[in-house]
Amino acid sequence: MYGTNLLETMGKPTAGHLGMAVTFTPKAYRELHEKYAAPFTNRALLQQQDILRVHVDKLITALRAKARNKESVNMGEWSPHTQPDTYTTFDIIGDICFAEPFGCLDGGESNEWARAIINIFKAATWDQAIRRVAGTGTLLHKALVKIIIPAEAAQWRTIHFSNSKAKTLARLADPDRQHPDLIKHILDSEDSRAALSPTEIILNMVLFISAGSETTANTMTGWTYFMLRHPEARARATAEVRAAFASPRDIKWETVRALPYLNATLEEALRLFSPAPSNQPRVVPACGAVVAGCPLPSGTTVSVAPWAAVFSARNFADPERFAPERWLDEGGADPRYAADRRGASQPFSTGPRGCMGKNLAYFELRLVLAHLLWHFDLEPTDSAAGRECMRRWEQTDMDTYQTWMKPDLWVDLKEAQR
């Protein structure tokens, strides 16, 4: 809970514009949300299914080569040559935003922009604290950013903004290109085209690229860790996927949503390893509010710590246990978790300001995870380094900067035998 001057200090625009991340008045946020919402609907995602499949196929091809060469794969932190989760989500978000991927999966090596993304969250954590004191776009804000944000993180942030700007302007200059990307939706909407300036579009593309890649990659890696740690859950999810699909071409949005146990493992991974573990603040409206019996004046900011919510025994039975069964309904429900308050787990936040990319994230995650289990048997790498990585994933000493600074996670893959 914070003071009551947040609207005054954080609601000031930069060059006359605000991105969605720092738009605080409900009316302004609602207007922006409406202009960008179309590409994230289920209907739009179905049109983008072929885009996602291209990148998933590239991922599987790269992993198959590793499996055949008996090479371990790092599914975790940045690695010079193997960061499959991040490569996949980064290429997908590039294709969905700008009509062209960033080439990570094609090259198999980390490019400059991909390396920048994790540092965006480090810089943003510092910037969020600065804005609470100095406002947005003020002279004091700019001065404190230069003084306080670590130089390396600030440099990567500049690279991210510069690249996002260049890609956005290039796509806006090519309105006739027929590709169901986000900017195409804006160009095809007369209302959005008239209402959004290039500066506003750039500011939000900066957000979409970072929020739409690293957070989803974190979830994939976190899910992989839990499946490695719990072989019985891994075996059950694998059996479900392979029984459901005779061919990988059958793995589609419509069908993968109907796999109850795979989806339960995903929900449980999202609960225990939320892609956005930091608090998501909300502002008390003009009429005031009462929270947990405490009267709060207008303008007060409040938030709930996701970690506290999901690890509270008030909300979940045996909260530290990875138990996909707690998410199953009739036919597979476990009575031990019947009283769980599932709504306490909100990995994409909730309400009008909930993550507008939620549908896309679920689409990517289900598609990639189903393909991974259909094609490969997964095992933790049996080496000193592999065991140390598994220990570090116990989250007792893992840093967060709005998202997790995930350690390496070494995995051995074996092609499924049929």
Curated annotation (Swiss-Prot):
Belongs to the cytochrome P450 family. Pathway: Hormone biosynthesis. This is Cytochrome P450 monooxygenase ABA2. Heme binds at residue 355. Its cofactor is heme. PANTHER family: CYTOCHROME P450, CYTOCHROME P450 MONOOXYGENASE ASQL-RELATED. Cytochrome P450 monooxygenase involved in the biosynthesis of abscisic acid (ABA), a phytohormone that acts antagonistically toward salicylic acid (SA), jasmonic acid (JA) and ethylene (ETH) signaling, to impede plant defense responses. During pathogen-host interaction, ABA plays a dual role in disease severity by increasing plant susceptibility and accelerating pathogenesis in the fungus itself. GO terms for biological process: abscisic acid biosynthetic process. GO terms for molecular function: heme binding; iron ion binding; monooxygenase activity; oxidoreductase activity, acting on paired donors, with incorporation or reduction of molecular oxygen. InterPro entries: Cyt_P450 (IPR001128), Cyt_P450_CS (IPR017972), Cyt_P450_E_grp-I (IPR002401), Cyt_P450_sf (IPR036396), Cytochrome_P450_monoxygenase (IPR050121). The keyword DNA-binding does not apply. Its EC number is 1.-.-.-. It holds the Pfam family p450. Gene3D superfamilies: Cytochrome P450. Keywords: Heme, Iron, Metal-binding, Monooxygenase, Oxidoreductase, Virulence. The keyword Metal-binding applies.
